[in-house]
Regions:
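Non-catalytic helical/linker scaffolds that mediate oligomerization, partner binding
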Residues: 1-239
Length: 239
């Protein structure tokens, strides 16, 4: 869970807010995915201090990449202690927003507001179950992010395309932002591709309130430049 500046579109890095199931020593029941399912592992050995796994889908594991449990549905019963500690430490600051990863139905927003009552809560749509609960989530949060990375890993590429293509952001009560490879070329280059700029224009024309940068700022060569380029494009396109 990452705080965002509530005064502007939250262009920045987010991290998963939970470790849903801690494997007990000797557990080998879980499959893990990393980097939006580009990599996948099966757990072979777990102790209290380390985990060993066999790669099912191999490749380079880049820094600052999420590690997720593949088996779903996974339901959180409460806010994890480490996130509660983060909220406690930041609750006195004004103008903060907190993005809640892998939100299920929006009820999780209450956990954040109990600890940080003045903060805005953003629901990250990253799991198949959230797609069916999108209206409920929208009614309980202050904004939603459509996170195409993890969501695409769950829905599959065609399923993701159909879901995103059918979205009508203006039909929802809260701002909706698009996340996941929106301006990915900025990760390694000073300018986006023409295709990305056209895509950004289409998103704004459809009613999306803005975009969320991920690799562009998390592992990019020039995070500040990426944000500046995105902000300039949003301004010039009327976002």
């Amino acid at each position: 869970m990452t705080p965002c500046d509530g005064r502007s579109p939250p262009l920045g890095r987010t991290t998963s807010p939970f470790r849903t199931r801690r494997s007990s020593p000797g557990s080998t029941s879980e499959t893990l995915s990393a980097d939006d399912d580009r990599l996948r592992f099966t757990v072979t050995s777990v102790t209290p201090t380390f985990l060993e796994a066999t790669a099912l889908r191999r490749g380079p594991l880049r820094p600052r990449k999420g590690l997720n449990v593949v088996e779903h549905p996974v339901r959180l019963l409460s806010l994890p202690a480490h996130d509660r500690a983060h909220l406690d430490a930041l609750s006195g600051f004004a103008g903060l927003s907190f993005a809640f990863s892998f939100m299920l139905d929006g009820s999780e927003a209450r956990w954040v507001r109990e600890v940080a009552p003045g903060a805005a809560v953003i629901g990250k749509i990253e799991r198949a179950e959230a797609v069916a609960s999108l209206a409920d989530i929208d009614a309980r949060v202050d904004a939603t992010w459509i996170c195409r990375g993890d969501l695409g890993a769950q829905l599959g590429m065609p399923g993701l395309a159909r879901f995103v293509g059918g979205l009508a952001p203006r039909a929802f009560g809260q701002p909706m932002l698009m996340a996941g490879q929106v301006l990915e070329h900025l990760t390694s280059h000073p300018e986006p591709t023409r295709s990305e700029v056209c895509h950004l224009h289409d998103l704004l024309a459809r009613g999306f309130a803005g975009v969320v940068l991920s690799d562009e700022t998390a592992i990019g060569r020039d995070p500040v430049g990426a944000v500046s380029a995105a902000r300039s494009l949003l301004d010039s396109l009327g976002g």
